[in-house]
């Protein structure tokens, strides 16, 4: 076992220290230049589209249509993104890599926004019908766009095991630690409650999943941001110092000489990817479920999800920690560091608040992570027996994760996440021309004053699409 752990650790070091960082930053920049930094230029359009998808009129109309709304799909991907990485992961990055790690998390979010746009637009282009819903993601665009079902199958296995099983164990482990610190609650009870609540949702289908995260995600995000804003306002005079610390430690001479710069970059990129998932190939599984009139609409909304996760939620945690006196404490790490930092700002009840917040963040991640596995189980086989076996395995891992920290399992999650990212990034490079063409089509229609509507025939060479044939609009079912 020790030998296996060493091998996995060595592979992870190579993957995360060299290959993945180079690919994430390099391809993120490539996509950014090819789309002319659309993730910045069209930020206002992203907000508008999200608002339209969340309107009461849209939500009422969506109940009678296929698929889920663009806002529900956004909440599904955000549910997976916004989890323990936002509270515990940021704390780990700061304690091990210093304040400079925050800058690299920001950077990977900004340039990763372009990668998120490309992969989510492709997921919409190649989505398939599934009864009165849609499904899709990397496995589907690998099969239909690259004609490589075998590659899609490999990706499906990786995401099902890593997100549905291992990452969900990570989430429940962090919740158990937070509740132990705040209430001294038996970890087995925490795991049982989480598994029970999750079972009610995952046996109800994609629309029940969408409704659940649509309720949880906005509430938990607003409350957490409000608390963070209170901390910032009450420490407003220290904000310039925090920014100074972040940028000095990101590029400082001390870090270069002492080797700390590498740790800051490595941890910032790694935790940034774990948190916002840009380019990893996970969020496209949620993006494909949306019923929209143009793939670019959901590409924009999923890009906004990356920014919401890292530039907003992760930054809240970073400022809570860096505005405290405990961020250099050697004996604090992970969720305990976040709890102690917030306690310094708002009093001892902060540990209770963080425990509840981490429960909501993590539970929403359990739901989102589960769905990623489900849609890929359907790609692989679609057997009800296999799907139910997967559901039971997910619930078992939630229970196991609450009571056990098995380092080799966490290392295996890092390995699978890295391989997933590499496979997905290579795939979207080869297919990106269709996302670029779809963006051109969208912008052209917007300039003509139209609400953009997409047809596959508008892009030369685009084949094997199921949901974008021109005759399909004859039924007048208007998407959101």
Locate predicted features:
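Alpha-helical membrane segments and immediately flanking helix-loop junctions
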Residues: 58-94, 122-125, 131-139, 143, ...
């Amino acid at each position: 076992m020790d030998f296996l752990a060493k091998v996995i650790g060595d592979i992870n070091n190579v993957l995360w220290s060299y290959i993945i960082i180079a690919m994430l930053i390099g391809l993120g920049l490539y996509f950014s230049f090819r789309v002319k930094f659309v993730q910045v230029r069209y930020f206002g359009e992203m907000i508008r589209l999200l608002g339209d998808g969340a309107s009461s009129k849209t939500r009422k109309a969506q109940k009678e249509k296929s698929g889920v709304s663009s806002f529900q799909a956004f909440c599904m991907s955000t549910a997976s993104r916004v989890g323990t990485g936002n509270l515990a992961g940021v704390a780990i990055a700061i304690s091990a890599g210093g304040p400079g790690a925050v800058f690299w998390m920001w950077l990977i979010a900004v340039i990763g926004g372009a990668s998120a746009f490309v992969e989510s637009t492709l997921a919409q282009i190649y989505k398939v019908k599934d009864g009165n819903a849609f499904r899709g993601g990397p496995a589907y665009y690998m099969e239909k766009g690259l004609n490589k079902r075998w590659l899609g199958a490999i990706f499906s296995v990786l995401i099902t095991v890593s997100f549905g099983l291992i990452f969900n164990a990570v989430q429940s482990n962090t919740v158990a630690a937070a509740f132990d610190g705040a209430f001294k609650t038996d970890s087995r009870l925490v795991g049982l409650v989480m598994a029970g609540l999750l079972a009610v949702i995952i046996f109800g289908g994609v629309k029940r999943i969408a409704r659940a995260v649509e309720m949880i995600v906005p509430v938990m995000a607003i409350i957490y941001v409000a608390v963070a804003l209170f901390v910032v306002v009450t420490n407003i005079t220290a904000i310039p110092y925090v920014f100074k610390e972040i940028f000095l430690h990101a590029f400082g001479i001390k870090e270069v000489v002492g080797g700390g710069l590498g740790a800051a970059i490595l941890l910032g990129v790694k935790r940034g990817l774990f948190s916002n998932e840009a380019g990893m190939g996970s969020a496209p599984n949620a993006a494909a479920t949306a019923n929209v009139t143009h793939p670019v609409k959901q590409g924009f909304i999923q890009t906004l999800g990356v920014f919401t996760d890292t530039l907003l939620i992760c930054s809240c945690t970073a400022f809570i920690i860096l505005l405290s006196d405990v961020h250099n404490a050697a004996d604090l790490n992970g969720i305990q560091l976040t709890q102690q930092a917030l306690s310094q700002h708002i009093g001892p009840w902060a540990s209770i608040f963080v425990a509840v917040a981490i429960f909501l963040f993590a539970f929403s991640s359990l739901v989102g992570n589960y769905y990623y596995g489900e849609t890929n189980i359907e790609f692989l086989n679609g057997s009800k027996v296999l799907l139910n076996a997967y559901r039971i395995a997910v619930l078992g891992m939630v229970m196991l994760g609450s009571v056990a920290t098995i380092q080799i399992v966490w290392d295996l999650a890092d390995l699978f996440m890295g391989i997933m990212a590499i496979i997905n990034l290579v795939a979207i490079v080869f297919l990106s021309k269709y996302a670029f063409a779809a963006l051109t089509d969208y912008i052209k229609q917007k300039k003509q004053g139209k609400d953009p509507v997409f047809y596959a025939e508008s892009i030369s060479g685009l084949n094997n699409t199921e949901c974008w044939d021109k005759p399909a609009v004859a039924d007048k079912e208007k998407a959101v």
